[in-house]
């Protein structure tokens, strides 16, 4: 069978051209109809699309899914060519194609709308995303800030925690202290109640000022702050303050009293020192030169205490100085030499002050007589020393001077006031004054002389006795002697004569101390006389009488061993009286051997003094060969002194024999003349002008030798023995005068 298209083609081919034209017109008509149908369907789709857009998006997918099959069905129907009209095949195909195109366009439009919507929503979401990102950044910044705040807060927390711990510890301590203070306050209240003390009141309930308030803080071993202690003390000062003021006032009064007593004691010390200065001027200390003595002598011119106080002080100081003299006799001799040499170059008023220290013991008119005679004796001594230096002979001088008394050293000070002049004229003037004072006062002179001798002995007694006992004996003897003597002219004569004798006798003091048989009495006053010594011969008897009495009194004070040796020495003296003596040359040689330590200055002085003395002694030996009746007793008394001295005396005694070169017989003639003169004139011992001076010179030489023994062998003697010696001296003096 054939197809319809083949059949139609066969018909066209069969028809005429006219038939072909009509067929084409019908095809064009069909095509136009189909286009119109498509446009109508498109409009309907658009209308439906608008409705879909107005619906929610949920329903959009559902509607689209429902419409698609319909559209697809319509399009498929149109595209299938299955039209309701029977037409050609071309018309049906075109109608389906258009419908499908329209549906595709509608779906495209919908997809584009959906895309647009998706793009809008995407942009919105993007905006939201950026917003959220910004918010996240800000939140992160806030988080960092918060983290920093958290760290700071943690640090502060730690600090606060530590501070809290400290505060907690301090709080615990304060609580403990608070408990202690509370306990202390409780104890304080208990103490106050116990003692009945009311604070902040001037009067206590019990009427007593108790110190318990100040001691409350120390009662218990608890700790109390300074404020509380100050409060307690301030509260306690109410009653206790007055007591403290009273104690302070008492202390002030005691201090003022002590100052006044110190001032009084300081004022008394210069007075004591003035008394001691007088004695220091009288005695040259060992190791001290005459130049050093002068300031002390000047200081003694100042006013001091009463004469009685001076006497006691001088006695004590003399005893102490006698001990120092015994220890170093060599220094004493050397100081005497230097004092003499210095005295010839300078004339000073110091000797009067030196002598005044010891002579102040004599009061009344005696002091005036002493002053007059001291000036005369010092003038005569100065002349004698100058003459001694003018001669160029040598005299031995021992290194040791034994038993020098403070009087000897005192007179050494007086040598410094030596002036030129005729010595014999001075002696005559002194003798005139002595004779005037001695007329009718023989008994009183003897008593005063014995008193003075005993004073000299008692001063040396201080070596063995205590100072208190010595002062007691000395005061008793002074009072007894002053009551017995109505006038002290004789004493003045004796003291001044002794001063002159000491000045002349110093170079020969050691030589006087001889062996028991050697004649020890040498008149130092003979040094001043030349070949014709007639005046000296006339003045020597009375001096020897005084010398004899003085030596006897001092020998009486020796110990029992010394008294036993007197008889032996008298016998030896008689046997050795006529013994030959060494020559002056041999004596000078021996002295040069014995004195190796003596300086050149001392040797020159000794040579000059020796020549002068030998020139004075030789004429006397020729003119006075007679013996005196009492000369042996005097020699025996002189020998008893050096027997107790040191062993150095033996060597010196041999020199004495050579220096003396005389026998005891040569000195007895003037004594006999003096006894005759005394018998003719009665109580007046001698009126020759120079007798007193000569007697003092020889008497003091014996006194020096006796005192050397006294210082060596004295033990403690009582005042009774001194009184017995005074009586014995009186009786012996009467015997010699008869």
From Swiss-Prot:
Expression triggers: Up-regulated after artery wall injury (at protein level).
GO cellular component: cytoplasm; nucleus
Coiled-coil stretches noted in the UniProt entry, renumbered to this chain: 94-194
Compositional bias segments (type: Basic residues): 563-577
Polar residues composition bias: residue spans: 314-326, 371-380, 483-495, 520-534
Cell compartments where the protein resides: Nucleus; Cytoplasm
Entry's Gene Ontology BP terms: negative regulation of transcription by RNA polymerase II; regulation of transcription by RNA polymerase II
Signal peptide bounds: none
Chief localisation class: nucleus
Region called DNA-binding, residue ranges: 479-580
Low complexity compositional bias, start-end: 78-94
Record cross-link Glycyl lysine isopeptide (Lys-Gly) (interchain with G-Cter in SUMO1), residues: 249
Segments of skewed composition (Basic and acidic residues): 40-65, 253-262, 277-297, 330-347, 381-400, 467-476, 535-553, 606-626, 691-703, 720-738
Gene3D superfamilies listed in its UniProt record: 1.20.5.4090
One MF term in the entry's GO annotations: DNA-binding transcription factor activity, RNA polymerase II-specific
Residues found modified as N-acetylthreonine: 2
A Pfam family per the record: LRRFIP
UniProt keyword terms in alphabetical order: Acetylation, Coiled coil, Cytoplasm, DNA-binding, Isopeptide bond, Nucleus, Phosphoprotein, Repressor, Transcription, Transcription regulation, Ubl conjugation
Sites of Phosphoserine modification: 16, 83-84, 88, 92, 302, 346, 348, 551, 560, 675, 701
Annotated region (Disordered), positions in chain: 40-98, 253-738
Family: Belongs to the LRRFIP family.
Record remark: domains: The DNA-binding domain is intrinsically unstructured. The coiled coil mediates dimerization.
Subunit structure: Homodimer. May also form higher oligomers. Interacts with FLII. Interacts with MYD88. Competes with FLII for MyD88-binding, even in the absence of LPS.
Described function: Transcriptional repressor which preferentially binds to the GC-rich consensus sequence (5'-AGCCCCCGGCG-3') and may regulate expression of TNF, EGFR and PDGFA. May control smooth muscle cells proliferation following artery injury through PDGFA repression. May also bind double-stranded RNA. Positively regulates Toll-like receptor (TLR) signaling in response to agonist probably by competing with the negative FLII regulator for MYD88-binding.
UniProt-recorded name of the protein: Leucine-rich repeat flightless-interacting protein 1
Source species: Rattus norvegicus
Lineage summary: Eukaryota, Metazoa, Chordata, Craniata, Vertebrata
């Amino acid at each position: 069978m054939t197809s319809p298209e083949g059949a139609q083609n066969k018909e066209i081919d069969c028809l005429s051209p006219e038939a072909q034209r009509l067929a084409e017109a019908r095809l064009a008509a069909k095509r136009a109809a189909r286009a119109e149908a498509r446009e109508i369907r498109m409009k309907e789709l658009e209308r439906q699309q608008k409705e879909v857009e107005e619906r929610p998006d949920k329903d959009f997918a559902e509607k689209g899914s429902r419409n698609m099959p319909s559209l697809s069905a319509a399009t498929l129907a149109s595209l299938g060519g299955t039209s309701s009209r029977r037409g050609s095949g071309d018309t049906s195909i075109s109608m389906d194609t258009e419908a499908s195109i329209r549906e595709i366009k509608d779906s495209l439009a919908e997809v584009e709308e959906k895309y647009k919507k998706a793009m809008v929503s995407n942009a919105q979401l993007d905006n939201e995303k950026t917003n959220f990102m910004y918010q996240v950044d800000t939140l992160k910044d806030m988080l960092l800030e918060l983290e920093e705040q958290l760290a700071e807060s943690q640090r502060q927390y730690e600090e606060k925690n530590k501070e809290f711990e400290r505060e907690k510890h301090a709080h615990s301590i304060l609580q403990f202290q608070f408990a202690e203070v509370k306990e202390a306050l409780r104890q304080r209240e208990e103490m106050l109640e116990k003692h009945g003390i009311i604070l902040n009141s001037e009067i206590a309930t019990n009427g007593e000022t108790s110190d318990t308030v100040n001691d409350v803080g120390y009662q218990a071993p608890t700790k109390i702050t300074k404020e509380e202690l100050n409060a307690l003390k301030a509260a306690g000062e109410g009653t206790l303050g007055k007591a403290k003021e009273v104690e302070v006032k008492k202390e002030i009064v005691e201090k003022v009293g002590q100052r006044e007593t110190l001032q009084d004691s300081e004022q008394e010390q210069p007075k004591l020192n003035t008394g001691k200065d007088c004695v220091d001027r009288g005695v040259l200390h060992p190791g001290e030169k005459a130049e050093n003595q002068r300031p002390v002598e000047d200081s003694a011119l100042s006013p001091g205490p009463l004469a009685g106080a001076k006497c006691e002080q001088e006695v004590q100081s003399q005893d102490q100085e006698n001990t120092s003299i015994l220890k170093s006799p060599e220094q004493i001799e050397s100081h005497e030499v230097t004092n003499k040499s210095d005295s010839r170059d300078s004339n000073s008023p110091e000797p009067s002050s030196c002598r005044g220290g010891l002579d102040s013991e004599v009061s009344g008119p005696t002091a005036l007589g002493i002053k007059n005679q001291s000036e005369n004796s010092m003038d005569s001594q100065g002349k004698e020393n100058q003459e001694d230096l003018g001669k160029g002979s040598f005299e031995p001088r021992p290194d040791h001077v034994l038993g020098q008394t403070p009087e000897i050293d005192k007179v050494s000070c007086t040598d410094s006031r030596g002036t030129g002049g005729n010595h014999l004229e001075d002696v005559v003037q002194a003798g005139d004054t002595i004779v005037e004072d001695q007329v009718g006062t023989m008994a009183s002179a003897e008593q005063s002389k014995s008193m003075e001798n005993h004073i000299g002995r008692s001063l040396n007694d201080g070596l063995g006795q205590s100072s208190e006992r010595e002062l007691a004996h000395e005061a008793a003897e002074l009072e007894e002697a002053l009551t017995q003597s109505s006038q002290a002219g004789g004493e003045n004569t004796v003291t001044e004569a002794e001063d002159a004798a000491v000045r002349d006798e110093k170079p020969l003091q050691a030589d006087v101390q001889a062996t028991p048989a050697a004649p020890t009495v040498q008149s130092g006053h003979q040094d001043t006389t030349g070949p014709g010594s007639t005046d000296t011969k006339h003045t020597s008897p009375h001096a020897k009488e005084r010398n004899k009495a003085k030596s006897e009194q001092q020998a009486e004070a020796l110990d029992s061993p010394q008294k036993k040796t007197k008889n032996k020495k008298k016998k030896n003296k008689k046997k050795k009286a006529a013994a030959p003596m060494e020559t002056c040359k041999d004596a000078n040689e021996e002295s040069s051997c014995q004195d190796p330590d003596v300086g050149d200055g001392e040797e020159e002085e000794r040579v000059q003094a020796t020549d002068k003395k030998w020139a004075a002694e030789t004429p006397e030996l020729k003119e006075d060969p007679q013996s005196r009746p009492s000369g042996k007793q005097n020699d025996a008394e002189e020998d008893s002194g050096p027997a107790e001295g040191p062993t150095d005396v033996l060597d010196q005694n041999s020199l004495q024999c050579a220096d003396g070169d005389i026998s005891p017989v040569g000195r007895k003639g003037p004594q006999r003349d003096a006894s005759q003169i005394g018998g003719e004139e009665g109580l007046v011992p001698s009126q020759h002008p120079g007798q007193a001076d000569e007697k003092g010179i020889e008497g003091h030489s014996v006194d020096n030798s006796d005192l050397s023994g006294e210082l060596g062998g004295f033990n403690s003697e009582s005042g009774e023995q001194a009184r017995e010696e005074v009586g014995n001296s009186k009786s012996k003096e009467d015997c010699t005068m008869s």
